[in-house]
Curated annotation (Swiss-Prot):
Organism field: Dictyoglomus turgidum (strain DSM 6724 / Z-1310)
Enzyme's top EC category: hydrolase
Function: RNaseP catalyzes the removal of the 5'-leader sequence from pre-tRNA to produce the mature 5'-terminus. It can also cleave other RNA substrates such as 4.5S RNA. The protein component plays an auxiliary but essential role in vivo by binding to the 5'-leader sequence and broadening the substrate specificity of the ribozyme.
Name this protein carries in UniProt: Ribonuclease P protein component
Catalyzed reactions per annotation: Endonucleolytic cleavage of RNA, removing 5'-extranucleotides from tRNA precursor
Annotated SUPFAM superfamilies: Ribosomal protein S5 domain 2-like
Keyword field contains ATP-binding: no
Amino acid sequence: MGLYFFPKEERLKKQEDFLRILREGKPYSLSKNFVVYIRKGAEKRRIGISVNKKVGKAVVRNKIKRLIREVYRLHRPYLKEDIEMLVIVKPGENIKNLDFHKVKEMLIKIWEKAGILKK
C-alpha cells in the first residue's frame, strides 16, 4: 500500500478504548466545540472520532467525520507512532460550515501544541 492510507487497525471503535483515552489522555482544543484528547505511550497510532448528535443530521455529522479522517490520513506519516487520539466535535455556530481547510488548520495547530508531529 501507499504512504497515505488509513488501515482498519488504526480506528478506535470500542467504547472501552474511547473511555480509556478520555481518562488517560490530555485534552487539547482551539475552541469549545472541537476537542482532541491525546494519549501518548500507546502501542500503535490510532484515532477515534465522535460527533455529537446535536451538531446536525447524519449527513452533516458524517461529512465532519469524513473531513477529520481525510486530514488524519494525509498527515498520518508526519505523526508520531505511539499516540491514540479521540476527536470530539460538539455543537456550535461554525461547526456545520467546516470545510477541509478549516479542519486541517485546527488539527495541525492542535498536533503542534501537543508535540506529536515528527520533526
